[in-house]
UniProtKB/Swiss-Prot annotation:
It comes from the Bacteria. Keywords: Cell shape, Cell wall biogenesis/degradation, Isomerase, Peptidoglycan synthesis. This is Glutamate racemase. PROSITE patterns: ASP_GLU_RACEMASE_1, ASP_GLU_RACEMASE_2. It comes from Symbiobacterium thermophilum (strain DSM 24528 / JCM 14929 / IAM 14863 / T). Substrate binds at residues 16-17, 48-49, 80-81, 192-193. Pfam families: Asp_Glu_race. It catalyses: L-glutamate = D-glutamate. GO terms for biological process: cell wall organization; peptidoglycan biosynthetic process; regulation of cell shape.
């Protein structure tokens, strides 16, 4: 007999190409520690940034099927590139369960945080090419000047669990130099891998530039949505945090333990395609 699980105790699903979305999972866990989380990442196809958005969109749709199978009550697309690829599906509520991305909350926070209206976005190539951040920021602040920069090397470093040190600092300096040359006062960490190295980034950009972590803004939006729908988990105690990966679960856990010590209870492999690339 299938065990009945109250709607409030159903898990929240989080999706990313790799370990980056753990920054969003951590933000949700900090704000809603009683919630059960299922983190699913597509490390078999990592990184998403250089891939065509149509391909990323297809990957995302398959993961949504997985989250439905896992009886999730809500899904967070903890990946900016996947959010850009599937934005029309998210806006149209095209799935059996609510799903929301990280771009809109991050864009709204950046528009509010900036004093001068000069906003930088560090992201993947796919996110930059989509134009989703400039478009969304200007919905909240039409006069905003937005400059973007793709930082693929930082995505790779964070996925490896290398988030500090002299070489990382040099790479951050090189990546962000074009943005800082535009005299921005706000920088959106437009890839969920980047908050893992927020301390180095803040040190490079200086105290006059405010960092915006879309994951934290998304966690607030998730809490509000669950509250309005009567789906907040009342507890007791901390929720379970399980991970699934299309890659090597042991490798995932090794890196996850460095990026979020104690944050993931267990990891397992999932095979979602008949033949993985």
């Amino acid at each position: 007999m299938t065990q009945y699980i109250p709607d409030t105790q159903r898990p929240i699903g989080l999706f990313d190409s790799g370990e980056g979305g753990l920054t969003v999972a951590r933000a949700v866990a900090d704000l809603l520690p009683q919630e059960n989380l299922i983190y699913a990442c597509d490390t078999a196809h990592f990184p998403y940034g250089p891939r065509p958005l149509a391909e990323v969109r297809a990957f995302f749709r398959r993961f949504m099927e997985f989250f439905v199978e896992q009886n999730c009550k809500l899904v967070i697309v903890a990946c900016n590139t996947a959010t850009a690829a599937a934005i029309d599906l998210l806006l149209a509520d095209a799935f059996p369960i609510p799903a929301l991305g990280v771009v809109q909350p991050g864009a709204a926070m950046a528009a509010e945080a900036s004093v001068t209206g000069r906003i930088g976005v560090a992201a993947t190539q796919g996110t930059c090419d989509s134009g989703i951040y400039p478009q969304t920021i200007r919905l909240f602040r039409p006069d905003a000047y937005v400059v973007q920069q793709a930082c693929p090397i930082l995505v790779i470093r964070a996925e490896e669990g290398v988030i500090s040190g002299p070489e990382v600092r040099r790479e951050v300096e090189r990546c962000l130099a074009p943005i800082l040359a535009e005299r921005v006062d706000t920088l959106v960490l437009g890839c969920t891998h980047f908050p893992h190295m927020a301390k180095v980034i803040q040190d490079v950009v200086g105290p006059a530039v405010r960092l915006v972590d879309p994951g934290k803004a998304t966690a607030v939006q998730v809490a509000d949505l669950l509250r309005r729908r009567g789906l907040l988990n009342p507890g007791p105690g901390p929720g379970q945090r399980r991970a699934f990966t299309t890659g090597d679960p042991q490798r995932f856990l090794e890196v996850a333990c460095r990026l979020w010590p104690g944050g993931v209870d267990a990891a397992a492999h999932i095979h979602l395609w008949s033949q993985q690339e």
